[in-house]
Regions:
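Gly/Thr-rich phosphate-binding beta-strand-loop-beta motif of the actin/hexokinase/Hsp70
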Residues: 1-6
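Glycine-rich phosphate-binding loop plus the immediately following alpha-helix
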Residues: 9-47, 140, 149-153
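Short, surface-exposed connector motifs at secondary-structure boundaries
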Residues: 10, 76, 99-105, 128-132
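Conserved ATP-utilizing enzyme core subdomain
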Residues: 21, 38-71
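Adenine-nucleotide phosphate-binding core of ATP-dependent small-molecule kinases
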Residues: 65-94
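Glycine-rich phosphate-binding loops at beta-strand->alpha-helix junctions
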Residues: 98-125, 136-143
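Acidic, glycine/GT-rich loop-and beta-edge segments that sit at the periphery of enzyme/chaperone cores
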Residues: 150-184
């Protein structure tokens, strides 16, 4: 935040470009491989872990290999799942954030933000609390919303999208829906 400004501003942005191990699709693949629903069980299962094992996070092949080894030595599944969450959080810290100072508040967006195991892993890895780690109720659609604004503001389409005003009104409304349909 700038002094005297009520709005937070984006200071920096990075995405993982090294390996698929830092992506939501990798979590999905591993959840399917071990027979756990990513939507209903994965995150909650990982919260049961007290001492997550160390799993390689830089490379999806090494991470999968570590998980298979842990299964072979009868490591509880909730510990393996938590270990994977922490591996991805450490991967973010070391490869994406690198040596940069991570300033708060931190906005966690994308579909992975719905995973309570990943939320826990990020908070613990980055040493932040609930006030410093924000998850928007629109976390899964923030990329699409940003694409709409980018396209409109840069005049990239011949027939400009006219729904941004309705979108802004909807997003800024005080009404809280569990699941909403947005008609644009």
């Amino acid at each position: 935040r700038h002094k005297g400004d009520e709005h937070a501003r984006l200071v920096d942005f990075e995405m993982n470009s090294i390996c698929a191990a830092g992506t939501g699709s990798f979590l999905d693949q591993q959840a399917r491989r071990i027979g756990v629903s990513i939507e209903n069980e994965f995150g909650e299962m990982s919260l049961q872990s007290v001492n997550p094992p160390r799993i390689a996070g830089r490379c999806s092949v090494f991470a999968k290999s570590d998980m298979i080894h842990l299964q072979q030595i009868a490591t509880p599944l909730h510990d393996i799942v938590a270990g994977l969450c922490f591996a991805l959080a450490r991967n973010f810290r070391s490869n994406i954030a690198r040596s940069k100072e991570i300033k708060t508040p931190i906005l966690f967006s994308g579909g992975v933000a719905a995973n309570s195991g990943m939320v826990r892993a990020f908070k613990e890895t980055l040493h932040v609390d609930d006030k410093e780690f924000i998850i928007s109720p629109y976390h899964a659609s923030m990329g699409a919303i940003g694409a709409i604004y980018y396209t409109k503001n840069n005049h990239l389409i011949k027939n400009p999208f006219s729904g941004t005003e309705m979108l802004e009104k909807h997003l800024l409304s005080d009404i809280n829906y569990f699941v909403t349909l947005l008609n644009l």
